[in-house]
Amino acid sequence: MKQVTIYTDGACSGNPGPGGWGALLLYKDTVRELSGGEEHTTNNRMELLGAISAISALKEPCEIELYTDSQYIANAINKGWLQGWKAKNWKRKDGELKNIDLWQELDKLLSLHTVTFHWVKGHAENKFNNRCDELAVIQRDKFSGK
């Protein structure tokens, strides 16, 4: 199974507002950059879309180390929240699950790969996370008309 490292980030101006996401896929000596955005979105949707888009770009099952500065995503996976939401028919104990469409899509993708999620501090010394942030901000600014 191929071993791939993924970095993702999201950015939003206002919440909701224009937003963007960026992702890097690292395989051997190759780095592939991906990015996108939406005119009216939230920071959490952009974080999720970054992860979903990066994993979706893989053409075969892989062993993935995914790095995100989103505690929302890292905690949902690493603390078992995602599995709990799924077991409760995609609901939280206090009601509606936000971004259910994206969580369901991510869950399907995770079943195709072996993925380990890592939280990294945003806007720090990690050059890969910082590049994802740059890509996300470029997209956010594009959708905000800057």
Label for each model-derived stretch:
Residues A11-P18, I52-R131, L135, R140-K142:
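RNase H catalytic domain
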Residues M1-R45, L49, S53-C62, D133-K146:
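RNase H-like nuclease fold core
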